[in-house]
Amino acid sequence: GETETARFGCRKFEIDPQKGFILNGRSYPLRGVSRHQDRKGAGVAITKEMMEEDMALILEMGANTIRLAHYQHAQAFYDLCDEKGVVIWAEIPYITMHMHNGRANTLTQMEELIVQNYNHPCIAVWGLSNEITAASAVNEELLENHRALNDLAHKLDPTRPTTMANVFMLEITSPILEIPDVNSYNLYFGWYLGELDQNDDFFDTYHAKYPDRCIGFSEYGADANPAYQSARPERGDWSESYQAVYHEHMLKMWSERPYIWAMHVGI
């Protein structure tokens, strides 16, 4: 007969609307990156050595969580995350625009993601979609698709919560935010638009209005060229100097708000 083996690990975690991420009964603030499985010259067909290099860089910067954006990643990388103790957000490629005839495909993607990966202890949450309202109206069809995905995820894996990454334009009163177990937002105040303090204001406003909901920071960042330095860094100058100002602000903002359950730098 055939034999199938699978590694597994035991851990307990919860996401609290006031205390954030809790691992094995202790506060464990999640700070990390959003990773794409992609390399110049290799595309998505990256080697195990490339995966190990990615992981080494991520750990060197002090990260303890990775959002695997925005699709299924290689089993070898999930294994690596198990070995290194990195907390994972895994999600399906349901991105930016809802397609009228795409419902069945999203459900298949979710089923395959969970069935193939549920034994990996590194995975903490299943992601339903990414910035799906960027080019789609919040209508009943969109809501129903997310309800179906949410129900399927709970049916296949009742041990893990669901989440989704919401685009910054989505109003915090939107009914789609009521569907997943925990929420998260992609915000780029201080880079693409606005000022850095608007990130602080957003989370303060959200938490004040919905103190019993869990909220995370699923994407943020500022592009830079290391060759560009400035004595007077400002938004949009592409300098490494401004990028440093940006990330220093974000880390301070996050450290003062323990309820933010995770932060993932957009890469």
How should each PLM-predicted stretch be described?
Residues 76, 171-172:
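Short acidic active-site motifs
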Residues 2-147, 162-163, 209, 215-218, ...:
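Active-site-adjacent substrate/metal-binding segments within catalytic domains
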Residues 131-132, 168-170:
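Short, internal active-site loops enriched in acidic
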